[in-house]
């Protein structure tokens, strides 16, 4: 069997384009489509070419499910056909984000719709079957725990559930969809590989909303569910059962366990770590490379699966981004030298994104631009968004040319 491209002992460099899609709208809630807001639909070819120019070997890039399947079972492949062909022609590998927060408009109640797991699996199967040999690397669903917090615990995104009960309902539905997605893709493309991506979570202080044990276990709940670990005696079994999840629903995961090929760790030094205030609000805590090391080691020790840094960057000045690029890569190389198989490094986002708070505001998108990328997006007098290479772009190119100095 041919060795997968990530397993050749090199450190592979990639970038990712922010691809949050929440198309539902309501009073005080605008739809958010990051591709539309960043004019990626118009500039996708330039954006992909820029990624290759930066030195990226792979890109984390998502599919807007709500546009590709505008009606149940009816697919519009025209744009994806063009994009996939261009990626192949320029030699840019894609780790396909099949789900990045939002569902199609026709799926009422979104993630808690009883048909969601099979709907998302059917969509994933159709994508995998059509693009087999071009796109063979998949993330079934990006950041499931964040997804469950926003959609099930905080009531921020549809279906707007709240509390532990809502979190439990959403995370179980998401995890079941992830299992069915991996099963369906594997059925039509045996060469497919899977990168499970979740947000890193770290906490400081004592004013926690749940016990520290529950919080620390809950950050792993999606991966523990899909790999069949949440059985009686597991801390999350009691948590989920206590919030209305039936025993037969939990047992389903043990009977249908899947294992991803890689674990993707998302880490941002400025806000992955938080401190809770007594009133329940949170403040971000700067954690630097110590936080990155901590999360990578936690996932490696728990699952024993190869690691990919699937998102990291720092907002603010170009100087701060330059510093983080160097610091984070040095930490990754130290971990590799110690025997931790960190196989990939992804600067995410590749270019400017629009803060999610845009969805709950009336101000123009430009007021919510967050510059964290190798490329800054700047609006011109003609309203077009220009892509402007920063010094971080050149520094990333240089690091790619140098390559990793240490092999895993």
Language model: regions and residue ranges:
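Short, basic, glycine/proline-bearing loop/turn elements
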Residues: 30-33, 69, 280-281
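Aromatic- and glycine-enriched glycan-recognition loops and surfaces
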Residues: 35-54, 71-86, 90, 115-122, ...
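N-terminal carbohydrate-binding accessory modules
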Residues: 1-55
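Short, well-structured secondary-structure segments
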Residues: 57-67, 93-97, 308
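Active-site region of glycoside hydrolase catalytic domains
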Residues: 2-14, 84-320, 330-408
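Short active-site-adjacent helix-start/loop capping segments
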Residues: 23, 59-61, 67-71, 103-106
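Catalytic domains of carbohydrate-active enzymes, especially glycoside hydrolases
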Residues: 37-64, 256-264, 298
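Conserved strand-to-helix beginnings and helix N-cap segments that scaffold or border functional pockets
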Residues: 73, 77, 319-325
């Amino acid at each position: 069997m041919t060795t997968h491209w990530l397993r050749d002992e090199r450190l592979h460099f990639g970038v990712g384009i922010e691809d949050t899609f929440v198309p539902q709208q309501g009073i005080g809630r605008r739809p958010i489509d990051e591709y539309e807001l960043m004019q990626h639909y118009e500039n996708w070819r330039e954006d992909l070419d820029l990624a290759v120019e930066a030195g990226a070997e792979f890109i984390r890039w998502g599919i807007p499910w709500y546009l590709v399947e505008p009606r149940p079972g009816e697919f519009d492949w025209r744009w994806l056909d063009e994009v996939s062909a261009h990626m192949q022609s320029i030699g840019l590998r894609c780790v396909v984000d099949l789900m990045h927060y939002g569902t199609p408009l026709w799926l009422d109640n979104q993630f808690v719709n009883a048909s969601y797991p099979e709907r998302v699996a059917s969509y994933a199967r159709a994508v995998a079957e059509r693009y087999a040999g071009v796109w063979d690397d998949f993330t079934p669903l990006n950041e499931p725990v964040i997804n469950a917090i926003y959609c099930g615990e905080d009531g921020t995104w549809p279906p707007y559930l709240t509390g532990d009960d809502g979190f439990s309902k959403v995370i179980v539905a998401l995890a079941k969809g992830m299992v069915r997605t991996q099963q369906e893709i594997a059925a039509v493309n045996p060469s497919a590989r899977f990168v499970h991506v979740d947000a890193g979570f770290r906490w400081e202080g004592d004013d926690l909303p749940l016990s520290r044990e529950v919080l620390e276990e809950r950050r792993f709940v999606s991966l523990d569910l899909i790999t069949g670990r949440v059985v009686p005696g597991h801390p999350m079994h009691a948590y989920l059962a206590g919030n209305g999840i039936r025993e037969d629903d939990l047992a389903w995961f043990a009977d249908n366990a899947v294992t991803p090929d890689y674990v993707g760790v998302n880490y941002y030094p400025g806000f992955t770590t938080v401190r809770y205030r007594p009133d329940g609000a949170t403040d971000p805590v700067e954690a630097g490379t110590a936080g990155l090391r901590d999360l990578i080691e936690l996932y490696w020790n728990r699952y024993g699966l190869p690691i990919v840094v699937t998102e990291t960057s720092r907002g603010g000045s170009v100087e701060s981004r330059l510093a983080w690029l160097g610091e984070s890569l040095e930490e990754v190389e130290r971990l590799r030298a110690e025997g931790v198989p960190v196989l990939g490094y992804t600067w995410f986002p590749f270019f400017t994104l629009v803060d999610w708070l845009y969805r709950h505001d009336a101000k123009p998108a430009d007021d919510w631009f967050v510059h964290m990328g190798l490329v800054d997006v700047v609006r011109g007098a003609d309203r077009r968004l220009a892509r402007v290479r920063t010094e971080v772009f050149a520094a990333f190119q240089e690091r790619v040319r140098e390559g990793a100095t240490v092999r895993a």
